[in-house]
């Protein structure tokens, strides 16, 4: 019988997984974590031996993280192979087989997703003899096109749809599109589909609806939700203060990639206002030039960043005498001295009689 000495899983694999999922930082250590449970796993194909995990659980902050070591046992050769260590904050299905590329064998996915943030680590599997796992890395672009590197920058901050669209465009204009480049595109497109499905959902909370669209880089669509909800416009900045870190990591990369996008400028300024204060934000806005679309967006997102509207000049309070023709005509008193010059009485005041 094959035997293999199994070591403990290091604590850093959990911390790194959570940091990647949240796109933030997390403290790491070299603490050894025990493997306590044996769990079998479905095989990607028939007659490929037995796949199983030795697993454990650990509380990391607010998350209960499942961690483990993946093994393969070849029945024909009685060979036992340790493949990879892993961790996942999703205890129900931390590992799965899923066809995401055009390869005959499905990929092994490790789910690092947290909340609304999809994040899956993918391995391509070669089953010739001892299984070989090859990570689909999104650290460095395979394509030599400079725009491919920019696409991966977008993907690594969670702007999956923008990254997928960029790579698809590069592919249509590329004469040497490799299988490795296609694997990167397939993995990014898989994430994009996941977050797009979330963005299409109807949320009871309008703030969450806007948040998901912003997470997917749908700048104009997020603004349209606000346009249809005047109540939300009044507190949009306040409601997103807890999401500053999540939004800023996307906005800062997106605005560098597309600096002339007026709606994106407005969202960037709104978050920058809370991060850096009004003075620095106004200075940054001034460097972007004028834009009517951005002004209309800022009226909803951060009106305090707009220059004050000029006050209308007060109308002069002049009391105009009515024109002569507008004065009412006073009835003439025949007995009045004014009726005839020099105070003479008008003949009309002398009674006359006519003989009959």
For each predicted feature, which ranges?
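Long, contiguous interaction/recruitment modules in multidomain scaffold/adaptor proteins
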Residues: 2-182
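Glutamate identity and glutamate-enriched acidic tracts
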Residues: 5, 22, 27, 31, ...
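Terminal, low-structured helical/coil segments at or just beyond the last alpha-helical repeat
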Residues: 260-356
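Alpha-helical protein-protein interaction scaffolds
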Residues: 145-304
